[in-house]
């Protein structure tokens, strides 16, 4: 590729990077310098337009990925996000255990880093996650008094959401609260408070940031008429009728090969719930079959409430399912056939 062509292609990206007059975090400033030097190589390996830009032309809000500080400091991850994606979800840094493993001792460093990176690079953020039975500090799990737990939930949600008020587009307020048959999962939250913990968390989040979209997020929402899908629909419809401010449903979409075919029917069923949004929130597919990836993307395109897609990581080597090679880039950060097939259907 000739130098002048490269410069023309790079101009919008480099222009979007923060200028030297902005007071950057030192690590981000160093990262920016590395990105500027490496962008030409990435353009040789990616689409001439970002997947994010392409999906926005189809009426959706974003195509994003999960990441965190450690991954962003590996320059290929950051550069790919810069060039091709429009949204980031913190993989771990906003989970309760990461933020407050010891009561009252808050660790904002990694979460702040991700938020700063996103803001300095014009990326939307999905906050993940406020209430989850896993990666939960022992001191929360050991609470045995309902009134204490109510206050702890309110304090946690209002503190975290309030810190990032106006900076985070959407929050996964509650995560994985259903069993496969659609009943409520047993956790410290449901054991002490029953369904009430859902209302407490959503109301606290709404009060802390009225502009943020508030989601309930879960896995195995990938087949129409599945028990969890039906149970979630019933519960969420009831909670909304009771005034609980639930704006959206997130379908994680951690799929096995062949699982993409059920996504459209499942999204169509979820769209009957009186929420304003749906989203594919944690997409990865065992073996990364092109057919399954394109089926999921086409499903989101076909359902008006589906606002966007987040893939759960960039490179296979960094995936929580690394042995199954489920992502769009291989271990060397080269785009895989599934990546190219998505670009093809979005063009």
UniProtKB/Swiss-Prot annotation:
Q: Say which enzyme class the record assigns.
A: hydrolase
Q: Which residues carry this modification: Pyrrolidone carboxylic acid?
A: 46
Kindly indicate whether the keyword Oxidoreductase belongs to this entry: no
Quote the InterPro entries the UniProt record gives.
Answer: GH10 (IPR044846), GH10_dom (IPR001000), Glycoside_hydrolase_SF (IPR017853)
Q: Which residues form the GH10 domain?
A: 46-345
Q: Which residues form the propeptide?
A: 17-45
Paired cysteines (S-S): 300-306
Task: Quote the catalytic activity from the record.
Answer: Endohydrolysis of (1->4)-beta-D-xylosidic linkages in xylans
Q: Where in the cell is it found?
A: Secreted
The biological processes this protein is annotated with in GO are:
xylan catabolic process
Q: Which UniProt keywords apply?
A: Carbohydrate metabolism, Disulfide bond, Glycosidase, Hydrolase, Polysaccharide degradation, Pyrrolidone carboxylic acid, Secreted, Signal, Xylan degradation
Enumerate the active-site residues.
176 (proton donor), 282 (nucleophile)
Which range is the signal sequence, renumbered to this chain? Answer: 1-16
| Coiled-coil annotated residue ranges, if any | none
Q: Which SUPFAM superfamilies match?
A: (Trans)glycosidases
Q: Which GO terms describe its cellular component?
A: extracellular region
| Full protein name | Endo-1,4-beta-xylanase 3
Record's Gene3D superfamilies?
Glycosidases (3.20.20.80)
Enzyme Commission (EC) number: 3.2.1.8
Q: Which gene encodes it?
A: xyn3
GO MF entries:
endo-1,4-beta-xylanase activity
**Cross-referenced Pfam families:** Glyco_hydro_10
Q: How does it assemble?
A: Monomer.
Similarity comment: family membership: Belongs to the glycosyl hydrolase 10 (cellulase F) family.
Its source organism is Hypocrea jecorina (strain QM6a)
Q: In which pathway does it act?
A: Glycan degradation; xylan degradation
Classification via PROSITE patterns:
GH10_2
Physiological role? Glycoside hydrolase involved in the hydrolysis of xylan, a major plant cell wall hemicellulose made up of 1,4-beta-linked D-xylopyranose residues. Catalyzes the endohydrolysis of the main-chain 1,4-beta-glycosidic bonds connecting the xylose subunits yielding various xylooligosaccharides and xylose. Produces xylobiose and xylotriose as the main degradation products.
């Amino acid at each position: 590729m000739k130098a002048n062509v490269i410069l023309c292609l790079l101009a919008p990206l480099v222009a979007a990077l923060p200028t030297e007059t902005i007071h950057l975090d030192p690590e981000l400033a160093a990262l920016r310098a590395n990105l500027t030097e490496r962008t030409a190589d990435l353009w040789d390996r990616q689409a001439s337009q970002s997947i994010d830009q392409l999906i926005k032309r189809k009426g959706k809000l974003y195509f994003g990925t999960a990441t965190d500080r450690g991954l962003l400091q590996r320059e290929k991850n950051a550069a790919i996000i810069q060039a091709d994606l429009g949204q980031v979800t913190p993989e771990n840094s906003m989970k309760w255990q990461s933020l407050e493993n010891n009561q009252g001792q808050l660790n904002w460093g990694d979460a702040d880093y991700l938020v700063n990176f996103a803001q300095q690079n014009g990326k939307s953020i999905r906050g993940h996650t406020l209430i989850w039975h896993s990666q939960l500090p022992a001191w929360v799990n050991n609470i045995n008094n309902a009134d204490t737990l109510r206050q702890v939930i309110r304090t946690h949600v209002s503190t975290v959401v309030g810190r990032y008020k106006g900076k985070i587009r959407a929050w996964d307020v509650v995560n994985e609260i259903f069993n496969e048959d659609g009943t409520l999962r047993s956790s410290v939250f449901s054991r002490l408070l029953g369904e009430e913990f859902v209302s407490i968390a959503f109301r606290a989040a709404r009060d802390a940031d009225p502009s943020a979209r508030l989601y309930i997020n879960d896995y195995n929402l990938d087949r129409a008429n599945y028990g969890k899908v039906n149970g979630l629909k019933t519960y969420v419809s009831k909670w909304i009728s009771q005034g609980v401010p639930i704006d959206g449903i997130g379908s994680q979409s951690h799929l096995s090969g062949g699982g993409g075919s059920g996504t459209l029917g499942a999204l169509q069923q979820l769209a009957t719930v009186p929420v304003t949004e749906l989203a594919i929130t944690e997409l990865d597919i065992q073996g990364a079959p092109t057919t399954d990836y394109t089926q999921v993307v086409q499903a989101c395109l076909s359902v008006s409430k589906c606002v966007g897609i987040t893939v759960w990581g960039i490179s296979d080597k960094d995936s929580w399912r690394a042995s199954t090679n489920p992502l769009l880039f291989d271990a060397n950060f080269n785009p895989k056939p599934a990546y190219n097939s998505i670009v093809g259907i979005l063009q």
